[in-house]
UniProtKB/Swiss-Prot annotation:
Source taxonomy: Bacteria, Bacillati, Cyanobacteriota, Cyanophyceae, Synechococcales
Keyword Ribonucleoprotein part of the UniProt annotation: yes
A GO biological-process term: translation
Pfam (any one): Ribosomal_L10
Organism: Prochlorococcus marinus (strain MIT 9301)
Protein name: Large ribosomal subunit protein uL10
Length: 175
């Protein structure tokens, strides 16, 4: 027995909600993947705040209809698709997908949409090579800490230099 109209509307509403919270969508051809392999992909994506959703292309079309951020996704809606919706750690999620594909050698990336723009395969690979948000924040914090340390040393050096000059001057006066 097929899905009811109400059930389909709930699915479309859920997909719209997921898309509103997502920064990027990656479309995978999941043909030939087992349930265990799909579960493996989902668990890999969990750490990066990504969600793998398998739904009919017609329901995805209804979900993106009228949404300018996701309209270009329509060109990828053919065949058997799994949609990876990424909320935060885009680079980490793309790395997880590529690692999964390397391990299973079954699924292919059909394409991705980021900030309303379709990405080429090379652009998707570039995103995977980016450091995570935590690494970038650590680098910025380290750079800021280095600047603060240099300023503190410079500020401390002025009175120290003055004290050395006064000491030398007093030693000259005593001799």
């Amino acid at each position: 027995m097929g899905r009811t109209l109400e059930n389909k509307q709930q699915i479309v509403t859920e997909i719209k909600s997921l898309l509103n919270d997502s920064e990027m969508a990656v479309v995978l051809d999941y043909k030939g993947l087992t349930i265990k392999e799909m579960s493996d992909l989902r668990s890999r994506l969990q750490t990066t705040n990504g969600i793998c959703k398998v739904t009919k292309n017609s329901l995805m079309r209804k979900a993106i209809d009228g949404d300018s951020n996701w309209n270009d996704l329509e060109s990828l809606l053919t065949g058997t698709n799994a949609f990876v919706l990424i909320k935060e750690d885009v680079g980490g999620a793309v790395k997880a997908i590529q690692s999964f594909q390397k391990d299973t050698k079954k699924s292919e990336t059909k394409g991705a949409l980021f900030e309303g723009r379709l990405l080429s395969d090379s652009e998707i690979k570039e995103i995977a090579s980016l450091p995570s948000k935590e690494v970038l924040m650590a680098k910025i914090a380290g750079a800021l800490n280095g600047v603060a340390t240099k300023i503190a040393i410079s500020i401390n050096e002025v009175p120290s230099g003055l004290a050395r000059s006064l000491k030398q001057h007093s030693e000259k006066s005593e001799s």
